[in-house]
């Protein structure tokens, strides 16, 4: 188990850095809710530069939750609005375009996470159809879904009936799509049966009291690492579903208060918008980075910097790890 004293922090002044993308250049990219919304670029020395939408206003901001990086320095933003969702592209010059705002003729609810499917398109998660989304913080709600957005063709719902769909990730083998269902406390997987096509849901494991699975990453051995909000936990999940707590920073009384509300189906924003801990600020995501992919970077909901620590194993490199981001670096004055 990681000692809290061994945690380092990088960056400062970030605004809701929920999701971290680590690039082989050493750059970290995180969502940023300042102004009209966009991302912040965090350099290896810790300095950060905001890259915000120039064609949106603070009255109509983008609120990125999950983000993905495209070749050429475009950043895809899963928009977590109060009522509306969608997927947007933020270009290096700060202009934006709508990638998707409806599926099957229906407007997208607030969206959670986006990731490449490995070549043919993107997967986008929607946690719940309920508005406000806090109505989905219940163990008996399963109206979340996953959209597949092909680079060529029409988007469609690839999986439905999920209990607060959060981060999804392709297994290193490419044969399975794993997904965290936060408020039914479950890590599930779907067999990839074709381009963007998924089989039936299978349960990898269920989590116990105090664990609310949010972030998801794989190491080179194919072991899953799950990040839990509220309890500030990182959980190692073996292939057989066996769980090991690797990191934890939580006040037992606070966790008991949240757990009681969850069990009574009375959980709401106050249970997520406050945290009682020593160092971590409601961690929500884990990204492997560093030159050897053995540094874990933790996204969070309530902090203004990124926590990091050394992992015992290297992470599986994601598709964005080596993409060309030269135009973005040049636009922000970071090109060497």
How should these model regions be labeled?
Residues 190-197, 239-244, 249-250, 310-320:
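Short loop/turn segments immediately following beta-strands, especially the blade-tip
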Residues 33-35, 80-85, 131-143, 182-185, ...:
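Short, solvent-exposed loop/turn segments at conserved positions within beta-propeller repeat blades
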Residues 89-94, 141-151, 323-324:
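Beta-propeller blade signature
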Residues 38-40, 86-88, 144-147, 186-188, ...:
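A short loop-to-beta-strand structural motif that recurs across blades of beta-propeller domains
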Residues 1-15, 51-53, 201-202, 268-272, ...:
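A short helix->beta-strand "capping" segment at the edge of beta-propeller domains
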Residues 1-5, 308-336:
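Sequence/structural signature of beta-propeller modules
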Residues 11-27, 56-79, 104-130, 140-146, ...:
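Beta-rich, blade/repeat-based domains predominating
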Residues 28-54:
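Beta-propeller domains
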């Amino acid at each position: 188990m990681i000692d809290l004293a061994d945690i380092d922090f990088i960056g400062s002044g970030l605004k809701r850095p929920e999701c971290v993308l680590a690039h082989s250049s050493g750059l970290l990219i995180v969502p940023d809710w300042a102004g009209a919304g966009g991302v912040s670029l965090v350099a290896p020395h810790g300095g950060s530069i905001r890259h915000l939408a120039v064609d949106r206003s603070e009255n109509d901001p983008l609120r990125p939750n999950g983000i993905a990086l495209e070749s050429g320095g475009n950043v895809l933003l899963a928009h977590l609005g109060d009522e509306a969702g969608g997927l947007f592209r933020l270009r290096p010059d700060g202009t934006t375009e709508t990638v998707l705002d409806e599926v099957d003729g229906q407007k997208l609810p607030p969206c959670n996470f986006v990731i490449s499917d490995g070549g043919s398109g993107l997967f986008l998660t929607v946690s719940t159809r309920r508005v406000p989304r806090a109505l989905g913080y219940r163990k008996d709600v399963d109206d979340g879904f996953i959209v597949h957005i092909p680079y060529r063709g029409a988007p469609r719902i690839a999986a439905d009936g999920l209990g607060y769909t959060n981060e999804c990730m392709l297994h290193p083998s490419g044969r399975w799509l794993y997904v965290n269902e936060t408020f039914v406390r479950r890590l599930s997987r779907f067999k990839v049966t074709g381009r963007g096509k998924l089989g039936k849901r299978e349960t990898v494991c269920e989590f116990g009291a105090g664990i609310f699975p949010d972030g998801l990453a794989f190491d080179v051995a194919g072991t899953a690492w799950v990040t839990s909000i509220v309890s500030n936990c990182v959980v190692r999940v073996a292939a057989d579903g066996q769980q090991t707590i690797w990191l934890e920073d939580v006040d037992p009384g606070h966790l008991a208060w949240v757990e009681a509300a969850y069990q009574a189906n009375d959980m709401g924003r106050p249970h997520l918008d406050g945290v009682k801990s020593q160092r971590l600020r409601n961690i929500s995501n884990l990204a492997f980075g560093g030159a050897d992919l053995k540094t874990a970077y933790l996204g969070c909901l309530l902090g203004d910097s990124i926590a990091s620590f050394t992992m015992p194993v290297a992470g599986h490199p994601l598709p964005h790890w080596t993409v060309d981001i030269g135009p973005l670096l040049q636009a922000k004055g970071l090109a060497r």
